Amino acid sequence: MTAKEQLKEISVRTHELVHVQYNTLNRSLIPALEKAGMHLVAAHENLTEAQSAFVDRYFEDNVYPVLTPMAMDSSRPFPLIRNKTLNIGALISKKEKSDKLNKKDKAGELLFATVQVPSVLPRVVQIPSKKDGDTTVILLEEIIERNIDKLFLSYDVVCAHPYRIMR
């Protein structure tokens, strides 16, 4: 097999494994957790007012102080992203009326930004539940995604998604 053929086969097999992984999560693990009274929520779901306030306060008090957001452009080299770290990648564009930061950035021009999900904090965060006796949790990367606009004040965040580099 050529290198190109090997990469294609690896990609096909990897996609199959990820499909199995998500089927197991969505068809077995999440229903079993919910049956036991544990709920995994996403930041974009309809959180209650108490849950939203808790998540935003948790971000401000615990997460924000340990984050190092980095935006890439022609004047800054691509940062070293450590192996096996979880990161949030975002597409950002400079706000129309912003004169802060890098003057070379044109309003509307898309830039790539990244922030490493801190390993010093727990990945799963318990938040207030809707129902007494239940446990509700949210992933740390969901909390960061929900508040990522607070990291890039002079920019509009177009989208943000978690990624992990494996070498």
Where on the chain are the PLM-derived regions?
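N-terminal non-catalytic structural scaffold regions of very large proteins
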Residues: M1-R167
